[in-house]
Amino acid sequence: MKLPAAAGDAIVIGPNAVRLIKSWGEQLCEEIEPHLSNATHAEMLDHHDRFIVRHELAGRGKGWFTNRGRLISILYEHARKLGIDIRLGSRVTKYWEEDGRAGVIVNDRERLAADCVICADGVHSAARAWLTGQVDTQQHSGWANFRAHMTTEQLAKDPEASWVLQGTREKDRVYVWFGDGINLAIMTMKRGQELAWALMHTDKFNAHESWAGGRASIDDALATLSPWPGRLRPSSVIRHTLPEKLVDHALIYRPPLDTWVSAGGRVMLIGDAAHPYFPVVGQGGSQAIEDGVVVATALELAGKENVPLALRIRATLTEENNVLMEAGNSRYPRATVIQLGSSTLQEHLFWPDWEAVAKDPSVFAFPNPEWILGHDCREYTHQVFDTVVRAVRGEGEYIPRNIPADGAYRVEDTYSPE
């Protein structure tokens, strides 16, 4: 089974995760870099297509913006070169945890056992239901997001649409339009060779929470923009989208879980399975990468011989059988603050206070929080590992230093790249 290299639309990887990927090797980064957008700013416009302000993108040029499928394909090939056993098309049909081991049943037939199981099975996680014993607590937000990716050959030939490629041979462009309950972003990549767009709207078309597609219509996307007096320019671009490349993705809110770690301490949720975000916060992929690195670092610090074998996390605790609990405890506050913040930011941007915007266009500025973008989760895990282990054993207190002191997410401009 081969991954489709250009599947999906686009993904943002923040500087906090880019630093981690860069640590995996120079050759890997050389493969990724030709596919990135080199845009550094975005033009903010209203629904009349009137210019509001030009803002610097989140990450101050240290983050990545690229095609989702291509990035995943490159990372997949990198993992294969490392000799990692990846089995595409293998469906996990059951999870188990018993007698000092944990594992999965694949395709209702093959039983696999391991020291621990890390579950990264996304927003529809079967592992989450097994681990928590809860039915999915999803709540439809009422929002959906048309999303698409395209190459730009046809745009260049269309006099009405070619405006979006002006200047992109030197610098990619980002345009963001705001209207009441509607938000549109158009972003070029690879010096104008590719383009992605995303149209946030109230869900009137029975959108699905799936990247595999479902019913999505270009006509519906264009109709969503029909009330805008300034729809001509963005519509000229959207209409070139191939139907098979369009997704209308429902935005589903899921409240934070009580825990990501199983009672036996051998099974853990990470990524969207643990803490799904709204895309507006631009940290979904980055926080998933942080999850993986923190778990790997915690396992490395404990050593294979110290991964829990018989004792349960909630029984007599020692450092050995706290390794996944340590990873969960150090990650949970940080990921949860960002998860809750994504909901707040969603409302803030999609029902703008136009009087406030007229007085201060910075209300549309991209979040640039130092505590998110400047964070080195690997170094932090080394620093707090022993403290968190002692806290789990009841021998002290762990006070997170990777979130704001009051635990509140704010739109702030505090990030200073190294």
UniProtKB/Swiss-Prot annotation:
Induction: Expression is positively regulated by brlA, a conidiation-specific transcription factor involved in the early stage of asexual development and necessary for conidiophore formation. Expression is also induced by the cell wall integrity (CWI) signaling pathway that includes the mitogen-activated protein kinase mpkA and the transcription factor rlmA. Expression is negatively regulated by the transcription factor sebA. GO terms for cellular component: cytoplasm. Disruption phenotype: Abolishes the production of fumiquinazoline A and C and shows a 19-fold accumulation in fumiquinazoline F production. Its EC number is 1.-.-.-. Pathway: Alkaloid biosynthesis. The keyword Cytoplasm applies. Gene3D superfamilies: FAD/NAD(P)-binding domain. It comes from the Eukaryota. Keywords: Cytoplasm, FAD, Flavoprotein, Monooxygenase, Oxidoreductase. The keyword Flavoprotein applies. One of its GO terms (biological process) is fumiquinazoline C biosynthetic process. Belongs to the paxM FAD-dependent monooxygenase family. FAD-dependent monooxygenase; part of the gene cluster that mediates the biosynthesis of the antitumor fumiquinazolines that confer a dual-usage capability to defend against phagocytes in the environment and animal hosts. The simplest member is fumiquinazoline F (FQF) with a 6-6-6 tricyclic core derived from anthranilic acid (Ant), tryptophan (Trp), and alanine (Ala). The trimodular NRPS fmqA is responsible for FQF formation. This is FAD-dependent monooxygenase fmqB. The lineage of its organism: Eukaryota, Fungi, Dikarya, Ascomycota, Pezizomycotina.
